[in-house]
Amino acid sequence: MDKYDVIKAIGQGAFGKAYLAKGKSDSKHCVIKEINFEKMPIQEKEASKKEVILLEKMKHPNIVAFFNSFQENGRLFIVMEYCDGGDLMKRINRQRGVLFSEDQILGWFVQISLGLKHIHDRKILHRDIKAQNIFLSKNGMVAKLGDFGIARVLNNSMELARTCIGTPYYLSPEICQNKPYNNKTDIWSLGCVLYELCTLKHPFEGNNLQQLVLKICQAHFAPISPGFSRELHSLISQLFQVSPRDRPSINSILKRPFLENLIPKYLTPEVIQEEFSHMLICRAGAPASRHAGKVVQKCKIQKVRFQGKCPPRSRISVPIKRNAILHRNEWRPPAGAQKARSIKMIERPKIAAVCGHYDYYYAQLDMLRRRAHKPSYHPIPQENTGVEDYGQETRHGPSPSQWPAEYLQRKFEAQQYKLKVEKQLGLRPSSAEPNYNQRQELRSNGEEPRFQELPFRKNEMKEQEYWKQLEEIRQQYHNDMKEIRKKMGREPEENSKISHKTYLVKKSNLPVHQDASEGEAPVQMEFRSCCPGWSAMARSWLTATSASQDIEKDLKQMRLQNTKESKNPEQKYKAKKGVKFEINLDKCISDENILQEEEAMDIPNETLTFEDGMKFKEYECVKEHGDYTDKAFEKLHCPEAGFSTQTVAAVGNRRQWDGGAPQTLLQMMAVADITSTCPTGPDSESVLSVSRQEGKTKDPYSPVLILM
């Protein structure tokens, strides 16, 4: 650390910190990553050392450069290039919702893809590609891939790792499902970074880890803006394929025209030639093999393509199968033609050398041929003899006597296993059956027993057992219901003396009472039996059944009445609104009886509805006010009149009908003391005036005065 001046801390991780420093000798800015070994487990120590080794190998314009590494006081220091633009996530957050242009997105994506191609070509998985591990420099124009802390070196590019590592938002479906993965996992993470550049947000988000994993495994994401090109839409959909086999490789991504045209903008011709030289190996090797002829050139091109597409195991199996068939079906020519074959055998290693490591496979094939066949001649693969050789395989195949003992043993075991399975399925009788020997004799005589009848018999037996179980269930249910009825008293107790005999029940000819309804008509029957003592038992049974029927009828009637009342509750609580009465006008009603009935009648004792109660209260109030007004009127106008209680009651009940004969005006006039009603002389006026004055003094309200 004496060679650097630490300026400030720019980051902190689980086991260390990152500082911005400046070299004392050259005054260049750099990043020093400090890792504390004391608190770190062994696996993390190995990962840190691995990062140092990887960074030393990585030299690419789009990968963060490695300067130096050293250890001091149990700490590891890694000196790396400083990117003044920060990481890509900070750049995305500074946009504040404003989308990047498509040119800017494609420029960054091509540079990230070039850096990823560099490490994939060296059989390294990054396994933590995310926006925080992509750094910008030169005012954000150059993107570089960094932080190889959890990268893994693979022995082969198709080797599958099983460790679940990575940031949750960038995890691939195979990691979430704990399945093997390879470099296609980095392709999924690369698609997540591209989606963030297009939308400024994560492609897969959830409230919890379980919801996030579910969306990742189903590849459910919102589409990007329709303002982007169709090629960009198609690329994102291909990067987010759930199956790793359906995702493109990094080389096929960079071969797309709209991305391939941008590569010269960020790499020099020398770097382009170095990075893409392995793709031109087949073109460079073609002129060297022209002396071998057209057939050799075709064979070489096919093998080079085969080498790039298929895994190593399939490369071994295909040539062995083909050459084994050719060797077994070989046609042996005369001795004079063997020299040409020896010449061809000498030329073949040259072809294999052109095709890469196929010389090792051909050597293994030759060794296998020499072991199987001792003659020293070697077969020559011919282009037009493949179909003929395959046809000769069936003709000149080895006889059964020449089959190896291991094959015969396996065949015997397979037959025994087949026989055992047939016995278990019922297709073949078991040796434990009593008539097994008879079946064997029939089979030896050519009479094959009917094994197909056995499944039908088994089905019939199963069906019988099924019906038997149903009968048991029915009987059990019948017994349970019988016990329940006994407890409820509906069924009489069984008499031990009753024997199971046949009884004849007939209706009686006795007349039925008219008062009884149809449902309540008594049932009278006559019994006949085939055994003595039937009458007592029949009578007891009849009485019990009739009693139970009466109870059931009563209960049924009560239930019907309750249902009617529940459906129409107004009928149950409906008040009587009218009383029907009859008046006999012929009879003479005395006043005394009427007064006694009025005294016995008490209005509050009657059953009143709510409306009648309110009217009764109003009537009481009016009556009280009427009494007060009558008393006041008596005091003011006629205190000496001396109305009796009977007249006051008559005034109060003025609107009611009296029970006696009506006292009309004519009767009152008949009682009055009047000498004549019609005046006959001139003195009549004086007589009338005198009578008026007398009437005024006697009673001002008399009917005579009213008529006057």
Swiss-Prot record:
InterPro entries, A to Z: Kinase-like_dom_sf, NEK_Ser/Thr_kinase_NIMA, Prot_kinase_dom, Protein_kinase_ATP_BS, Ser/Thr_kinase_AS
Cellular component GO terms, alphabetical: cilium; sperm flagellum
Catalytic reaction annotation: L-seryl-[protein] + ATP = O-phospho-L-seryl-[protein] + ADP + H(+); L-threonyl-[protein] + ATP = O-phospho-L-threonyl-[protein] + ADP + H(+)
List of residues binding ATP: 10-18, 33
Active-site residue numbers: 128 (proton acceptor)
Broad class of enzyme this protein falls into: transferase
Keyword Nucleotide-binding: yes
Residue ranges constituting the Protein kinase domain according to the UniProt record: 4-259
EC number(s) stated in the UniProt entry for this protein: 2.7.11.1
Gene3D superfamilies: Phosphorylase Kinase, domain 1, Transferase(Phosphotransferase) domain 1
Major subcellular location class: other
One Pfam match: Pkinase
Cofactor(s) required, per the database record: Mg(2+)
Annotated region (Disordered), positions in chain: 376-403, 423-454
Compartment list: Cell projection, Cilium; Cell projection, Cilium, Flagellum
Alphabetic keyword roster: ATP-binding, Cell projection, Cilium, Flagellum, Kinase, Magnesium, Metal-binding, Nucleotide-binding, Serine/threonine-protein kinase, Transferase
Compositional bias (Basic and acidic residues): 440-454
Molecular function terms from GO: ATP binding; metal ion binding; protein kinase activity; protein serine kinase activity; protein serine/threonine kinase activity
Membrane-spanning parts: none
Family (UniProt): Belongs to the protein kinase superfamily. NEK Ser/Thr protein kinase family. NIMA subfamily.
PANTHER family associated with the record: CAMK FAMILY PROTEIN KINASE, SERINE_THREONINE-PROTEIN KINASE NEK5
Protein name, per record: Serine/threonine-protein kinase Nek5
Species in which this protein is naturally found: Homo sapiens
